[in-house]
A protein has these predicted regions:
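Vicinal oxygen chelate
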Residues: 12-14, 65-112, 132, 142-148, ...
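Helical anchoring/docking segments at protein termini
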Residues: 3, 8-9, 29-31, 80
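Amphipathic alpha-helical segments
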Residues: 12-27
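A contiguous, mid-protein "functional segment" used to position or interact
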Residues: 107-124
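N-terminal beta-strand motif that seeds the catalytic metal site of vicinal oxygen chelate
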Residues: 1-15, 68-70, 121-160
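Short secondary-structure junctions
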Residues: 25-31, 91-94
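Conserved short beta-strand elements that form part of the metal-binding/catalytic scaffold
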Residues: 27-64, 115-120, 159
């Protein structure tokens, strides 16, 4: 068995679809009106359709309950942050910050209060450490990533022009 995707229940499909397309650069691969699938396997479904799927049982939606998130990675956080600033109406949960393992990320809400995280890819983080002069061992310790991954990133740096 394999996981096939994540489904988010939304109140306003048009607003949610625009958000994911315009803010997060997601591409729609299937649009059935009440059900939209984006590249990468996550889907949006209208609240009304969700209720029908549940045989009209009450839906205890926890919009904005801060208990789960969709996570995205970007190889250029500075460019993403410049893009993100074009959407002042988006409610931020956390500012852009760097965690102890070196990854920078920001968290904010989609139109229905689902948490969205956009963070640097760890490949970018590890390469940044290596470029700064950290050794393989120091990079492993700081990033908390295994030797094989750090060495793969180091090799990629060696092979790049």
């Amino acid at each position: 068995m394999k996981l096939e995707g994540t489904l988010l229940v939304v109140k306003d499909m048009d607003a949610s679809r625009r958000f994911y397309q315009n803010v997060l650069f997601r591409t729609v691969v299937l649009d059935l009106g009440a059900y939209v699938v984006f590249e990468g396997g996550f889907c949006l479904l209208t609240e009304g359709q969700w209720k029908e799927f549940l045989d009209n049982k009450p839906v205890s939606h926890g919009y904005g309950n801060n208990v789960c998130q969709l996570g995205f990675e970007d190889d250029d956080m500075d460019a993403f942050m410049a893009h993100f600033q074009k959407f002042p109406e988006i409610k931020q949960l956390t500012p852009l910050k760097e965690y102890v393992w070196g990854q920078r990320s920001i968290r904010f809400y989609d139109p229905d209060g689902h948490i969205i995280e956009v963070g640097e890819s760890m490949t970018v983080v590890v390469k940044r450490f290596l470029r700064s002069g950290l050794s393989i061992e120091e990079t492993m310790q700081k990033s908390m990533y295994p030797r094989e991954f750090v060495e793969m990133c180091a090799q990629a740096l060696t092979n790049s022009p």
